[in-house]
Structure formats: structure tokens, C-alpha cells
Amino acid sequence: MLWNCIPEHFYKKDNDIECVILSPEFSGLFFRFGVLYNLKEMMIIDKYFMQKAIELAAIGQGKTNPNPLVGAVIVKDNGIIGEGFHEKPGEPHAEVNAFLSATEPVEGATMYVTLEPCAHYGKTPPCADMIIEKGIKRVVVGIKDPNPLVAGKGIQKLLDAGISVDVGILAEECRKQNEVFLKFIIEKKPYVILKAGMSLDGKVATTSGESQWITSKAARAHVHQLRNNYEGIMVGIDTVIADNPLLTCRIQGGRDPIRIIVDSRLRIPIDAKVLDMQNESKTIIATTHLADSEKIKALQGMGIDIIVTKSINGRVNLESLMTILGEKDIDSILLEGGPILNYSALESGIVDKVMIYIAPMLIGGQSSKTAVGGEGIRKLSDAIQLEEISCRAIDKDILLEGYIMRQITSAS
């Protein structure tokens, strides 16, 4: 009897190790600390290999925009014989890279892929066609692709070819990994993440305005990873004037995000660091008709992209701005705004996710700034609500993440 318990066939759950039994005499069973269990229709194996595909997809983080993150694993006799991920737009998809890496013939194998295989010709041929041609017998898909060009067509093509298809393995994990793509492909608007660092009592600066640094070095390093992952970074003019930031990614080999400055009256100093075009990062300034036309021309002459929106109470129309940025293929924005811009973003409904770094300190002071300012709300029933909350430690700080559940109503 063969007890095939090489590392590739271990599955960790609740701090226990499960080992899949590949002996034909015990097909459909697995071995866990001396006890035989049912596999429950291969669910355990499917989750294990889909998790592998998710991990592969993550390698492309920050490089595939506006394409999705996709990972693929080819499995034969319960062993991985090929794997791949989508690296960047215009290059082979995850399924193709998995085939290219295969160590043996793939005919009769199972493919695990985090997102439905494409069925249309774009910059690359349809992956569904290649899967059929290669003789794959079963495909396990994390989630369907909402792209109108795909939207179930890839799965249907596989089924029509007689291939067994299962959809929904680790679907929530696959969905969260591609939350940016899933919004952008449908709405053509950026996925917006509001990021802030604060004290335990919600302060982002002292009474004198000092804010560097409330959070730990480890938390700030994590923020630079976010800057590498997302397409754009957005701040208000008050942040530019107060801090004169570069708004770049400090990770070696990382990618600088597109810098987006919200400046309703075009108060930005000509010598601001974000206007330094020697950096590879592009700078966009969003303003209104209140801006000086000569200054607009001067900034455009420096290579700055100026977007003029209709104003709302003298401020940039953030909803319109998101539409314009989407047309520029900016699929995600890390909002590192001050209190006023953060409130405006929440009030306008453009924020999708909130990430708050909380430092173990108390600052106090009625005049100390908080992460969200603006007019605020009068009734708790109107307060913004978060769902799917998670938190974890980053050094001495806590990172709290949540998704916007509903929009706020202005106090007025």
C-alpha cells in the first residue's frame, strides 16, 4: 500500500496536519494522525491547491493593473506538475504560464485557477481554448470573471468541450484578492482605500501640528507596500503645503504610484516636491473653475496633468474626478488625505475600504486633528458603518480594516 505523504500533499487545518492518501485501495480517504476520514468530495484537496493558486497570484501584486491577479496550478496524481501567475498586462496569462512550466504531459490533469479562464481574443489568445487543446479533464475555478467579455463564457466553453468544472472554491479569498479588479471592470471607477494613522484617541497630530511619527516604522513600511500595490495615491492641498511630501514608494524595486493632488483653488507651490517630474511618477492635479488659468498653463507646461471639475460648494467634485481617473485606467487609489479630504471622500461615497493604523499612545487636545473632520454627522443612525472588520498587529500598532457599509449624511 502506498502512503504518499510528501510535503506537497500535506494540508494544514486548525494547527493539525492532514495527509492525503493516494493509495487506490483507500481512494476518497485521507490520513490524519492515524485516523481515516472521508475527503468530502475532494473539498480538502481542492482548497489546498486553490490556496496555492492564490499565493501565486499574489506575486503579481502591483504589476498587473488594470488586469486581475490570477494564479493557476496544474495537478496530476495529487501532485503539482505546473504553476504560473499573470505577471503584467500584455504578457501570458496564469494558465499559459502554468502550461509552460509543466514538468510532464498535462493530459488528464486538473487545473486550479483563481479567476475564470478567458474565452475571448485580447492581447493574448483565449485561455479556455488552450485548456481544451491540452486535454485538461477538470478545472476548478475560484470565482467567475464579471468582465462582460468573459462573464461565464469561459466556463461554458469548457463545459461544452466535456471538461468537468467546479466553481466557488475559496471564493471569498479570491474575491478579496481581486477586489480592485472586480469593481473597476464593472464600474470603470477606481477602488478607493482610505488610509490613516492615529493615536488611540483618534488623533493624527498634536496640538502643535506635529505628526511625524505617530505610527511605528513597521507600520510605515507596510504603507509603502500599499503604495507599491495601488495605481494612485491621493492627498489634499493642505497635506502638500504642510508636509511637502514626495508621495513615492520607498521599497527597493517598488513602483511609484500616480500622484493625485486635490487642490480646488490651485494653491500648490510651484516648487512642491510632487511637481518634480524627474521622478518617474506622474502627477495629476484636480482643481475647479476657481483656479487661476495662467497657473494652470504654467503647470501644464511643467508636464503636470490638470483636471478641472465642476465645483461643489467650492470644492472638487470627487465623484466626477473618479469617473475621469477611471477613463485614464487608474483602477485603484490609496487615499492618504487629511481630515477635510477624508470626510469629503466619505460623504461623496467614493471610498470602498478603510485601513486605520492605531498607535498605542494618547494625544488629547480639542484642537488636535482627527482622521476625519468636516461637518460630521448629528445622529448615530447616520454614521458611516464598516463591515467585514479585521485587525492585526504590526509591531506595536494595530491595523484595522473594514469595508464601507453605507454612506454618511451631512450634518446640514
Regions found by a protein language model. Name each.
Residues 64-78:
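N-terminal glycine-rich anion-binding loops that anchor highly charged ligand groups
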Residues 37, 44-60, 65-67, 83, ...:
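Enzymes that bind and transform nitrogen-containing heteroaromatic metabolites
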